[in-house]
Amino acid sequence: MKQLESQPFQSKLNLNSEEFENNKSSMLEMISELNELLDEAEAGGGPDHHKRLAARGKLPVRERVFHFLDPDSPFLEISGLAAYKSEYPIGGGAFAGIGVSSGIECVIFANDPTVLAGAMHFYSVKKWMRCMQIARDCRIPFIQFVESAGGDLRPRAGAAVGGMGHFAESGRQFYEITELSKLNIPTVTVAFGTATAGGAYQPGMSDYNIFVKNQADVALAGPPLVQMATGEISSREDIGGAKMHAEKSGLAEYLAEDDLDGIRIAREVMSHLNWDKEGNNPRFEIAPPKYSQEDLLGIIEPSLK
C-alpha cells in the first residue's frame, strides 16, 4: 500500500499560554457536562425499571447491543442526546449507533424498554429515521432490537410536541424499511418483547426476524381491543406470540430461548450475509497524528458557536 507523501504541518500553538489554558479548562468543563448528560441517557428509565427488566430475565438495551457487536470493535453512538431539553428523557428512549458484528459494519437501532415501555415519540422517530438514512447512504445492514409499546399517542399537557405529532410520519418510517430491502440492503430484527401497533411493523417489514420465546409479542393490538372490535376472546400468544409467528404466520424465521440466544442467532445471520459495503477501501496507510489530540481543547474558545 503506497504511503501518501506530504509535508507535516508545523504547529505554532503555545501550550503554555494563558489563553490556551483558559480555553482548555472551559472545554474540559463542557466535556464533563456532556458526559453527565450521556450518563443520564444511559440510566434510561431508572434503577426500578432496570430491576423489573432483570427480574424477567431480560438484558438492558445497551448490553443487548454490546453483546451483538464484535469484542473490542469500534462503535459510534448516534443521537445520544436526542430529546435533550424536551419533555422526554434524554436519549429518546432508544440506543443507536454504527458498529461491527461478525466482521460486518452495520447500523443498530434499539428500543429501551425501561423508558415508556419503548414507546416511540417525535424524538425517537427522528433518531430511528436518521439510522435508516445512514444505512441507506452507506449501504450497510440495518439492525433493529425491538421492544416497543408502539407510538406514544398520549396528550401531554404543556408539551412542546403533542402526543400525535409524530403519528402522521409513521408511513414514511415503514416505507424506509422496505426501501432498504428494495436496495438489497439487509434488515434484521430481534423481537425481545412486546412490539405493539407501530412496533409490530418493525419486524413486519424486515428481511430476517428472530423472536424470543415467551417474550416476543408482535401484533397490531392486544386481546382487549380485538374483543372490542370483533367479539373474539383471545390470548396474547394467540395474536402475536413468538411460537405462533414461527409456526403459523411465518413472520419469525428463528426462535430464540432468551435474550442472549436471540443475539447469538442475529450474529449468525450477519455472518451468513456475505455482505461487502460498496465504495473504495483506503488507498494508503495513515500515520498516527504528530500532535496530541488533547491540544485541540485549548484551541477553540468556549463561546464559539
Region locations from a protein language model:
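Conserved catalytic cores of soluble enzyme domains
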Residues: 146-278
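Residue-level detector of solvent-exposed, low-hydrophobicity positions
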Residues: 16, 27, 66, 75, ...
